[in-house]
Amino acid sequence: MLPRRDPRDRTSRLRLVRSFFKTDEREEGGPIRSPFVVGLGNPGRSYGRTRHNAGYLVVDELAKRHDGSWRKRKKAEAAPVSLGLTNATLLKPTTFMNNTGSALSDHRPENLIVVHDDLDLEAGTVRVKVGGGAGGHNGLRSIIGRLGNDFVRVRIGIGRPPA
């Protein structure tokens, strides 16, 4: 687990995200506990490749690229992977979006990196953020309701549908 710190200090979380993309030595500060990378989406074939399942699509691609195999858990599918110098567990909650928080209630927010779709970002845009509100996203609202908002989010822009 990451050490407790001032909630306004986002440095350790952002260092955790950057560690995924490093292939050389880790930054000073000691080992970081293996994070859970959570892809938000809805289970079932009818939702499989919809834009709102962008989180599922990202963790599926990470599992494919890093030889992860999905295993069923109580309320999620999990795939342990090695990402650069960091081991992580990819998670796909098997609850519907509005109940995602119940699938993550056993996890500490500081160990989560939540990947989700964002209507307000242009399609293909990616932003990393720590903390904040739900922004109208029901999956985030559910997680925040259970765990608070102190977790890393990777926002995947899907844009608004044409009017």
Regions found by a protein language model. Give the residues of each.
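Nucleotide and nucleotide-moiety/phosphate-recognizing core
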Residues: 2-131, 140-154, 161-162
